Structure formats: structure tokens, C-alpha cells
Curated annotation (Swiss-Prot):
Low-potential electron donor to a number of redox enzymes. GO terms for molecular function: electron transfer activity; FMN binding. Residues 4-145 form the Flavodoxin-like domain. It comes from Desulfovibrio desulfuricans. Its cofactor is FMN. This is Flavodoxin. Belongs to the flavodoxin family. NCBIfam families: flav_short (TIGR01753).
Amino acid sequence: MSKVLIVFGSSTGNTESIAQKLEELIAAGGHEVTLLNAADASAENLADGYDAVLFGCSAWGMEDLEMQDDFLSLFEEFNRIGLAGRKVAAFASGDQEYEHFCGAVPAIEERAKELGATIIAEGLKMEGDASNDPEAVASFAEDVLKQL
């Protein structure tokens, strides 16, 4: 059994719904899962005690990538989380009208790799909440479960 932390930043509830569904699916796979809103998170050694960390963040932006405010504060301190040697995956909810649709996914993956993490699943990019594409959420969870 692995210990998995799911940290999310959500303004409208869409990313939170994805995080909650992932929590349910990964726990059903026999793993211990902690769900944490980025608004309640402190970066300092956040990943300690966890085998894997899943990060979820809504994002948008026409010219520049804009991340959800609570998550952005955490993202700016990623170097303090303790990601070296950890398994990481990213997911996001967004609006395809924006140039940076779900742009948080590649930003999170790139930064996590720079800090020594291993990306264990292709990032999940969704329009709206988990109910819009439950198969995509389930497939992402299965990919994560295979690497735990």
C-alpha cells in the first residue's frame, strides 16, 4: 500500500471534483489517500511521508499562464515541498477558449522533474468537472495506480 497526497487548487469547484474522484478511485485501489486544498497547504516538506503526490490546478490565460491563486502560492515554493525521489502526476481543469488550456499540467510536471521527481502518468487535462469525462478521470487514476 502506498501513501498518496492529492493537493488541488480550485476556484469554481471543477478541479476539486476531479481531486475528489481521484481520491475515491485511488483509495479503492487499496492505497491510503490524503486530499488537501492548496489553500490549507504549507510547502515546507509537504511531501514527507508520501510515496506519491498528485497536483491539481485550474489554469487559464490568453497571453500568460495564470494559475489558481491558492495553488500559485504553493507552486512558487515547490522547491520546499520535498519532491526529490517522489512519484508525481498532474491534473487540471480549464476552458479550451484560453490559449493556456490546462497549462498548469506541463508547468507542474516540468518543475517537479527539475526537483528530482518522477512523472508517473500523462497529465490529465479536462474541460469542466469530473462528471464531464469520467472515463478520462478513471484512465488517469488507472495509470497512477499502475505506478504505485
